[in-house]
């Protein structure tokens, strides 16, 4: 009979112990991590280049690892060894233990290991959804919480959703359902801030337990510890249903981000039951120092004075500035650049309104004063009057017209239309103020009829043509830059609107008069035909034609000689 040593010799090499899975440990990656922690990303890239290895970490991962790395204090291991009562740190644990995790202190559903929990069913939810409910993941989680009767167990990386927390707090306070919450250590401060804002103190809740959870720990030879994060997300309700997926209990995941959730029931829930108890045994309670710091910071934020901008009533100047910005060709320019110029425009607008009122008084009384150019047309009954007015133009010998601005003021009345043209000429002289007065040919012609309110006058580059009782401004050239303003004054805008309105009214009135005259002629036509008189048509005399120039534009009217 062969002995034990001979039996061992017959066994092939490596057959007694299982082979390690491939790629479970990589010495090159460990050395690269040492370089990253000690020298930063550049040192790690240099090491990978020397070893001719591809990079296995992205830029966000490098930043996350450096943010989680912390140097261990001296004597930390000795203190932890002496503080351990059961010497669990030096106790050997086999791969599979027959000892169950500890029972949770608030109670747990009475399911033994391997007990039947029903047929496994899966409900899949995607968010955003295109069905009846858009936010299906959030609604599914809230429905599970409302249906809880025995226990609510939650493992989450980030928990800041107010609606879901209110549902959990209501189940804890009103229905007395035990609640266990395990959160990532780096995100628990945000959860505590949310609780304080909602007026909930978790340390005084008798049916709620909140604990901290971390990922795996990685130690380097230089004494640096890298702590991983929690990425597990599942909600266990009554030990029979569980919701899991990439959906986090935050407002952004509930409204903005796309996510999915699986609602599982049946025998598969046993795996999540065991996993939660393992994680709860590995978790740590929240320290009193962290609670006090969160509370003090929230109180400081509440005491800060909230200075709201005083609401100001819109004034006339602010409204005018807004209109000035709208009319400007470059509205994005700062208003201060046009502040002084805008104030001058407002004063000039008031002065112009006063001058216009005085001019209207002069028109009524029949008096008219012209400063530079005088063109006045008066309608006379039964005849046309054409009047030419010499226009004086002042020019300098040394320099010609430097800047010229022409403004036209128009007044429309029932019997008279007055055109006022003002020309402002600036001149530059080198040695002497030598000027000459040169008469210019007739530049304004007024055409009148027996009952019309039209006038036509033109001066320089301003041409005004009036047909019927309407006036239309053709063109107004502003040469030079001395009087050029980039903003259109508000007063001119209202003047233009009034002129356009009067133009439309006069057009309608002239058309109505034309239609009345046509209808009156039609009434005379049957009488002529009934009398069997051959009508003789001839040109209407110019003296008794209708006063509206619109009839001349439409065509010459004929009528039977009576």
Swiss-Prot record:
Gene3D superfamilies hit by this protein: Endonuclease Chain A
Record InterPro entries: FAM83 (IPR050944), SACK1 (IPR012461)
Nucleotide-binding is among the record's keywords: no
Pfam families: SACK1
SUPFAM superfamilies, alphabetized: Phospholipase D/nuclease
Transcription recorded as keyword: no
Keyword line: Cell cycle, Cell division, Cytoplasm, Cytoskeleton, Mitosis
Compartments (UniProt record): Cytoplasm; Cytoplasm, Cytoskeleton, Spindle; Cytoplasm, Cytoskeleton, Spindle pole
Top-level taxon in the UniProt lineage: Eukaryota
Cellular component per GO, a single term: mitotic spindle pole
Region Disordered, residue ranges: 424-471
Main location: cytoplasm
Xref: CDD domains: PLDc_FAM83D_N (cd09184)
GO MF assignments: protein kinase binding
Single GO BP term: regulation of TOR signaling
Stretches with biased composition (Low complexity): 425-471
Function: May regulate cell proliferation, growth, migration and epithelial to mesenchymal transition. May also be important for proper chromosome congression and alignment during mitosis.
Family affiliation: Belongs to the FAM83 family.
Protein name: Protein FAM83D-A
Species assigned in the record: Xenopus laevis
């Amino acid at each position: 009979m062969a002995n034990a040593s001979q039996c061992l010799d017959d066994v092939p090499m490596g057959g007694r112990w299982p082979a390690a899975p491939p790629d479970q440990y990589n010495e090159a990656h460990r050395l690269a991590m040492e370089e990253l922690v000690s020298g930063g990303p550049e040192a790690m890239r240099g090491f990978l280049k020397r070893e001719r290895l591809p990079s296995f970490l992205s830029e966000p991962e490098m930043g996350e690892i450096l943010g989680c790395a912390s140097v261990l204090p001296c004597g930390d291991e000795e203190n932890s060894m002496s503080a351990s009562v059961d010497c669990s740190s030096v106790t050997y644990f086999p791969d599979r233990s027959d000892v169950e995790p500890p029972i949770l202190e608030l109670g747990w559903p009475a399911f033994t290991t391997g007990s039947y929990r029903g047929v496994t069913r899966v409900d899949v939810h995607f968010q955003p959804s295109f069905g009846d409910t858009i936010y299906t993941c959030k609604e599914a989680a809230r429905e599970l919480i409302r249906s809880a009767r025995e226990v609510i167990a939650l493992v989450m990386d980030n928990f800041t959703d107010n609606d879901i927390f209110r549902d959990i707090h209501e189940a804890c306070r009103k229905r007395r359902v035990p609640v266990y919450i395990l959160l990532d250590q780096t995100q628990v401060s945000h959860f505590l801030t949310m609780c304080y804002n909602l007026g909930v103190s978790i340390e005084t809740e008798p049916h709620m337990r909140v604990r901290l959870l971390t990922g795996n720990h990685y130690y380097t030879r230089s004494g640096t510890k890298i702590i991983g994060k929690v990425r597990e997300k599942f909600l266990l309700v009554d030990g029979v249903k569980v919701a899991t997926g990439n959906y986090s209990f935050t407002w952004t995941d509930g409204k903005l981000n796309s996510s999915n959730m699986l609602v599982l029931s049946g025998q598969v829930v046993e795996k999540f039951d065991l996993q939660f108890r393992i994680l709860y045994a590995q978790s740590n309670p929240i320290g009193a120092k962290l609670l006090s710091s969160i509370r003090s910071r929230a109180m400081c934020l509440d005491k800060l004075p909230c200075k709201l901008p005083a609401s100001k009533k819109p004034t006339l100047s602010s409204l005018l500035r807004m209109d000035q910005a709208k009319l400007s060709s470059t509205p994005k320019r700062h208003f201060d650049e046009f502040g002084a110029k805008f104030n001058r425009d407002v004063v000039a607008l008031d002065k112009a309104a006063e001058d216009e009122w005085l001019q209207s008084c002069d028109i009524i009384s029949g008096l008219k004063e012209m400063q530079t150019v005088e063109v006045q047309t008066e309608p006379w009954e039964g005849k046309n009057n054409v009047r030419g007015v010499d226009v004086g133009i002042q020019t300098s010998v040394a320099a010609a017209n430097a800047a010229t601005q022409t403004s036209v003021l128009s007044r429309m009345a029932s019997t008279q239309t007055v055109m006022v043209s003002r020309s402002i000429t600036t001149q530059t002289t080198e040695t002497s103020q030598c000027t000459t007065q040169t008469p210019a040919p007739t530049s304004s012609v007024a055409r009148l009829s027996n009952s019309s309110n039209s006038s036509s006058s033109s001066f320089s580059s301003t041409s005004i043509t009036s047909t019927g009782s309407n006036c239309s401004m053709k063109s107004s050239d502003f040469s030079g830059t001395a009087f050029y303003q980039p903003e259109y004054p508000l007063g001119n805008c209202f003047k233009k609107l009034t002129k356009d309105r009067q133009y439309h009214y006069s057009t309608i009135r002239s058309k109505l008069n034309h239609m009345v005259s046509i209808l009156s002629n039609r009434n005379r036509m049957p009488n002529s035909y009934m009398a069997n008189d051959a009508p003789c048509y001839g040109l209407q005399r110019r003296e008794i034609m209708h006063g509206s120039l619109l009839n001349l534009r439409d065509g010459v009217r004929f009528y039977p000689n009576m």
